[in-house]
Amino acid sequence: MILLQTSLIWVVYAVVVVVLFAVASVFIYVYQSPRDRSPSVTLTCIVAITSLLATILLLPVDVALVSSTVSSSVGQRKDWATPEVVDRITFSLTLVYYILYSLDILLCLLVVPFVYFWYEEYDEVAAQTGEQSSGQRFWGASKYTLSFIAILIILFLVGVFVPISRANGGNGLDPFKSLLGENRGERALTFALGLLITIGMYVYALHTSTGLAVLPIRLIKGGPRLSNAGSWNATFTVQLDSNRERRRQLEGRCGGNFDHLSSKDRRELDALIREERTLIRRQRLAQEADGKGNALLPRMWFRLEAFFRPFRRLVGLILLLLVLLIWVSMILTASDKAKNSICKRHCGYVLGHINIFNPINEIFVQSAKLFPIDYAIFTMLVLLLFFGTVVGIATVGIRFLWISIFRIRLGHTSPQALLVMTAILMLSILALNYSISMIVAPQYATFGPQTFCDRLSGSSVLPELQCVVKRCSEAFGSDAAKKVCTPSVASTVLNRVTVSFPFFGAIFFWSQFAFIGVYLLALITSLLRSPKLDEQQLDEDAEEAEEEALLSGSRRNMDDRWQSIVGRASRSEDT
């Protein structure tokens, strides 16, 4: 029975990983630029995102497996749940976690940078003429990746030798002292994981919070578009008439011979010609938005958009309420940690017992009794936070200080930007792993629905009723709790980071308040600001579409000419 139960749980996880691979594939395909697709970049981004999402979505499997050893209704371990069986379950989970975390670190610090430089080293002309071989390209990418290999080695060496916290028992650290006894390999991985989560907290506090505020409001209000297409069309018509009138004046001044124009007038004429092309493109877009264009597909798209607009607003409203519920839950747990943490900054604000009701946490604890309902809810939560981060990155952009380096847009993201965005998403997902497990749903992520039977000393009631069923918690140090309760491996790994290196735990904790503040500021800004149409970007997109159409037309013409030449040659041979 136990083998069948655990096998089904792992089968559900395998199905979820396949779904994640499909989601990552569609996500990368939708965002990458069709003109600059690279198979190596696409595959790397898909594998990296799938690996990170698979790591965080292992948590419900972790909770389900450790919770399956306990009968929550009576607070006792099941007959088959011997210490050896429980140790075997936790060992297998620990092994999977360490493999996934190691893979995540290697992908983020080694594979993604190498593929980035591999793409940058490609010279199309040199490759076509045979002047650049794959070996030369590999060596060029490897030289630049050596710095990341050095960072990775230094990171693990520092993790091996850096001293861990040795807080005394007076700090209330007794329930967590077992976490300090890991070997040096675990210590190195713990330090590397803590450092990457720390970097990811910046992305989480800035981009994820901004995206979660912008995404629902954008669905409710609608994105920037040609909302009043009729007036836009009239405006563009007037501007186009004015442009052409000025061109006629200049052409009349020179009598059709442009050599007679001054350099100033020639520059003005060139500017008017460029402006005319821009206005014609804008006028065509406005006509399509107004349903007056000749193209069938754009007209159908705008009509479908108008039909689904009420449903989109309903989805936006539901997402807004859900994100606000998550935000309130984070405030409650963060306040609980700040007030009731057993050892405050000495152990990274670890919370031994939940003292303030958390609605999201309670939803997960109750749904965990009916696996995989909690898994479905957890997956939707993770995907919401993931796509919120994507929207935040697209809104803020990839910047260094105030300088914009890359822009993330649907169908217009370059391979370099795609790789950088993937690395940023990997860091943010690591930070999300901590926030969901320790802030959003701490009881669920640590013990799930596990309970234990707390014996009542000196009770006069029947022996089978001489106990009170309580939820498991680290704060309970009784023998009954220790014999029954098994913390999840995910919570053990994260608590090991915060207890062994309290400065990481302090950064993680205070980053939650930064997230809360940035979200509130971004939400107020999104509510007050109306979406604006980026005319410059609209012109660039239209120009790019025209170039693509011209290139496609040129390719078709060349193919037709080639087929015609081949046909004439074959007919000549027959003759």
UniProtKB/Swiss-Prot annotation:
Transmembrane segments: 8-28, 46-66, 95-115, 144-164, 188-208, 314-334, 376-396, 420-440, 504-524
One GO term describing the cellular component: vacuolar membrane
Protein localization: Lysosome membrane
Record keywords: Cobalamin, Cobalt, Glycoprotein, Lysosome, Membrane, Transmembrane, Transmembrane helix, Transport
One Pfam family this sequence matches: LMBR1
UniProt feature, compositional bias: Acidic residues: 537-549
Glycosylated residues (UniProt): 233
GO MF annotations in UniProt: cobalamin binding
Main localisation: membrane
Biological processes, Gene Ontology terms: protein localization to vacuole
Region spans: Disordered: 537-556
InterPro entries: LMBD1_LysCbl_Transport, LMBR1-like_membr_prot
Keyword Transcription: no
Membrane topology summary: Multi-pass membrane protein
Domain of life: Eukaryota
Function, in words: Probable lysosomal cobalamin transporter. Required to export cobalamin from lysosomes allowing its conversion to cofactors.
Similarity comment text for this entry: Belongs to the LIMR family. LMBRD1 subfamily.
Protein name: Probable lysosomal cobalamin transporter
Organism: Emericella nidulans (strain FGSC A4 / ATCC 38163 / CBS 112.46 / NRRL 194 / M139) (Aspergillus nidulans)
